[in-house]
Amino acid sequence: MILLKQADVYAPEHLGIKDVLVCGGKIEAVGDNLEGGTGCQVIDAKGMRLTPGLIDRHVHVTGGGGEGSFHTRTPQVELSSILKAGITTVLGLLGTDDMSRSVENLLAKVKALKEEGITAYALCGAYGYPPVTLTGSVKKDIAFVDEIMGLKLALSDHRAPNISVDELIRLGSDVRTAGMIGGKPGFIVLHMGSGKKKLGPVFEALAETDIPVKTFQPTHMSRNHELYLDGLKLAKMGGYIDITCEDFVNGEPVIGHDPMPALLEEAKAADVPMDHITFSSDGQGSWSSYDEAGMLKEIGVTDVGNMYAQMCSLVTRGGFDFAEALTY
């Protein structure tokens, strides 16, 4: 039993100065002048902010990369890195490499993180097609494997499998149905590149079918402004989009400025429902840049701590209210 006294509590709405009683790993009470029982650990939290753990929906928990050959494969994430970033829930996924990495390995890491005390989920699939799976079936992976929430796929990227709209529709239908059977959200996380089609295939699939728009959830949506505008259109249709956080070092954006506040303000100006926009770290994945011929120029490892730094930057640089910054 733990009693935190006089914390400035966000849930994520601002509740003000409160006491919080935790028993058996669960919050049992939030209130004023709470008392703990015999053996209760009391923590003086005066002057501290107490928030829910962050949810990072894009973490390469087993590592990513590999686009510059085998020595550029990135290492798996460590629990300590996740916790230092204030993250208590992760969605683990694969990336470009679905040959030297597997759903089996991903699922084992996700289970290990759960055993270590955080909440962890996974996606089957990677960039490629047909999707890599545990059971041999996307539908069975989602319906029967507790940790698997949906599918990963790449679109509009030079590393994407360039599937047809009909194939995208089939995957959307399978994921939708499997999610219903398994009692899960059932969604496809779409790695978006800088390709000229942008979200065109998704809009075609939605126009031709009755698949719910929330089934297709694109990420890396700030890759260029044209793609972001497509994302705002999707969000206004009821879909969800995810923006990858900038890289930060010691709390400072590597590129010298933080574009996230302007992106979010643009969404507000366009009357986009802001609860349909998230941001994530892409932690332990690789950041990379390519020349005009498609040759790799640079590659590095993305820090899972970028999400916490991004949230802080929204407040300190963007002037966002802390309670709002927590919601993304």
Describe every region a protein language model picked out.
Residues M1-I2, V9-T51:
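Histidine-rich, glycine-flanked metal-binding segment
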Residues A7, V20, G25, G47, ...:
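Divalent metal-coordination and catalytic microenvironments
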Residues G36-M48, S137-I142, M260-P273:
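Short amphipathic alpha-helices and their capping/turn segments at secondary-structure boundaries
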Residues A45-A108:
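Metal-associated gating/positioning segment near the N- to mid-region
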Residues I82, V110-L113, G231-L234, A267, ...:
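Generic structural signal for hydrophobic
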Residues R159, E167, S173-S288, L296-K297:
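Active-site core of metal-dependent hydrolases
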Residues A269-Y328:
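His/Asp/Glu-enriched, well-ordered alpha-helical/loop segment
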